[in-house]
């Protein structure tokens, strides 16, 4: 119940004494700002919608979002960038030979019956588009498609909101300079509008510029004024006083500046009664409705997540999609345009001390009351004052541009995604930019998962701590053992990169099997497999598991000598002293490996490990393998020989402590890798494997708990541990 109706939760937890004043001031400020914004919407959206229709639709939408919405500071209403996308819809039924689309409104032509019929047709198209947009958003919310927003990182949302802020600033230049230009729609429209502004700049109104600068300076000074009410800081409601003050001055004094009076006088109707949309035009507006639904939905979700992160709470994206879908369905009956989260008013509501959706409810009531009873009083408010209020509140969203150098140093992938999202939203528009942002995020995520981070670990001298060999200069490695740490899940995307990394570090290459060898694998019998003897030492070690029958299509060979196999050492013992070695079997030859460790105060510490190689090659070599054990055993008799200090790799350890998922394809390739390395006499062991990975089909021995609990801190005593491989 609380998920479907989030308002029940905040109503029960509402702090009346602490939050009431802030919500009242924020609601009144938002309501006063929404009145002139609704009056100037027709100028920016290129659609002469009656102001009262916009007011009633905004009021109903605000009430719906208060009931179903999850963002506490969100203000729902018309947003000119979303409404500007309706220009492509208006081309279906061009009004007055394109004068409405190009921005040249001619009131005298409303007397013509054909013009009035075209005007009604355009309103019907807008209403149907809004209705279809709401239906699509409802379907997205019911199907749970809001999860897509969770895959977009913070950098993508910040870049998109920064591009939105720039589009808002560009649109307000009309009100700042008091000039009219022909807005463009589609790709590169941002730069076309800049060129049109530069051409029309000589006709700028100096009074509008002066009023704009006055408002900006007043709001800048207001940033230093704070009101504390019950230990909750509230920003002084300067927007409230600016709107009321300049509205009174505009009604008393005639100022040579642009107002909404001229635009309102051109609208033939003051109010149109609600009607059902015209469903006959649905096939013509499907693509435009999909574009509008995506832009308005993700703008609402991005803005909600941004505001929620500032106040340490979370929003439900699916619930917000359902809420905004209901808002657009209801507003379509009033022949209004598509509604979404109003960026400027949401920021004003947040900065003015709004804590819950009660502020939105107050703002909607104030807006409707003023539009019905005192709407004509705000006709004299200069548009430059409203532009100054809007720009002062959206400028903070551009601060992320100055943080690009630090973002590049922190994460180059996120910085690239930021620049790609921002540039595409500016050059190609918000609709195409949003699609490119989502695709880029998925692409970068795939690239990062493909380039999984795999570290080669070594031991810090005189400790049982293992770290990356690239991070520490004094790292030493266990002779004949390679330790790899996988820092991400293993999937079909990166498992082949893991395979390439293992082969590169071990110094081997993969050689595809011939058809005869593959055929012999299929026809090999169980008796022949049981007859094969695995080379092992004569110490007290547990028996190895039988070789798994896993098909493979390649074998691994050394790069320098393809005919030579790895040293035939799989399990061995670790002896602590020289005396212990004297009790060993006579068939074993000691092989000493010395590694120089860290120098400390002029002293050298030396770690000596003794492992044992088989002396009898006929007993310790498996059938079909080259006879190299004898030569290696004879070479080990040379004391302190340089060649003896470089043992071959006989064991690979995979640290899976950071791996939480292995898909089916990754599991198959891992099995093939283990089998191919085993045939090259290299044993692969897995440490730190989480129990959840065992559900993917890995066959385990009975004593798997020991394998699970084995940590990398015990690798220095690896030969004396009973560590079994699981493949």
UniProtKB/Swiss-Prot annotation:
Residues 592-727 are annotated as: Interaction with RACGAP1. InterPro entries: SLC26A/SulP_dom, SLC26A/SulP_fam, STAS_dom, STAS_dom_sf. Residues 45-47, 96-130, 182-198, 257-283, 382-383, 446-727 are extracellular. One of its GO terms (molecular function) is sulfate:chloride antiporter activity. It is found in: Membrane. N-glycosylated. Glycans are attached at residue 120. The chain crosses the membrane at residues 24-44, 48-68, 75-95, 131-151, 161-181, 199-219, 236-256, 284-304, 361-381, 384-404, 425-445. Its main location: membrane. PROSITE patterns: STAS. GO terms for biological process: cell differentiation; chloride transport; meiotic cell cycle; spermatogenesis; sulfate transmembrane transport. Antiporter that mediates the exchange of sulfate and oxalate against chloride ions across a membrane. Stimulates anion transport activity of CFTR. May cooperate with CFTR in the regulation of chloride and bicarbonate ions fluxes required for activation of the ADCY10/PKA pathway during sperm motility and sperm capacitation. May play a role in sperm tail differentiation and motility and hence male fertility. Interacts with RACGAP1. Interacts with CFTR; stimulates anion transport activity of CFTR. Belongs to the SLC26A/SulP transporter (TC 2.A.53) family. This is Testis anion transporter 1.
